[in-house]
Amino acid sequence: MAFTYFFRDLQTLEMIRDRVLPAIRTRRFIHIWDAGCAMGPEPYSLAIVLRESMGYMIFRNVRIHATDIDESGQFGDIIRKGVYPEEQVKRIPGPIFDRYFSRNGSPKHYRLADEIRNCIDFQQHDLLSLKPVRSDLSLVMCKNVLLHFTEEQRVEVIRMFHSVLVEGGFFVTEQTQKLPAEVSGLFETVVSNAQVHRKRSGNA
């Protein structure tokens, strides 16, 4: 089972906060796809950062669609409960932890606030099916997944992501994952030293 931590990639979260959020925060509905979410710390970390930056009223418009192939069949239950052991939450800054977590009945386990849990929905999903979760996404985040695919598969999946982003939507992947040449023209790079890309105008 994939074991991940909250706030594991703080640099990417800060990039989304500083470079992506200002461009999408005024939209009536903000749909985000976290493709390859594992046990949930990544989409929940993103939700916390967005809530901190947006405030309650705007954050109500956010929906994060978290998906994973989840061969264990256990991720959905973990994400829906929103209960995590101490070792997974220990990197969260103290004030943020105090705002969004409370002690659970189990020793050294903590439960996320309903406000954060309620903005996430989980689906078991295989990216290679090339079937998107929806077609009006402001942001697609896919980290540590594409590296497991062949170059041809990566191109197909990124084309699928591109097709479901709204005009000016964003695609974020890990820093070591460069865009294949076949799809690089579909996006403009927002941050030169990070894999934050924006759908080019006129590219349907």
What are these regions (language model features)?
Residues R28-S45, I64-H65:
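Conserved class I S-adenosyl-L-methionine
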Residues V155-E167:
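A short glycine-rich, Lys/Arg-flanked "PGG" loop and its adjoining helix->strand segment in the class I
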Residues M1-W33:
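Conserved AdoMet
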Residues M39-M57:
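Conserved SAM-binding loop of SAM-dependent methyltransferases across substrates and taxa
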Residues R25, Y84, V166:
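Short conserved AdoMet
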Residues Y56, R60-M141, V145-F149, Q153, ...:
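Extended basic-aromatic, gly/pro-enriched interface segments that bind polyanionic ligands
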Residues L139, P180-A204:
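Core SAM-dependent methyltransferase catalytic element
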Residues E167-Q175:
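Conserved beta-strand signature within the Rossmann-like core of class I S-adenosyl-L-methionine
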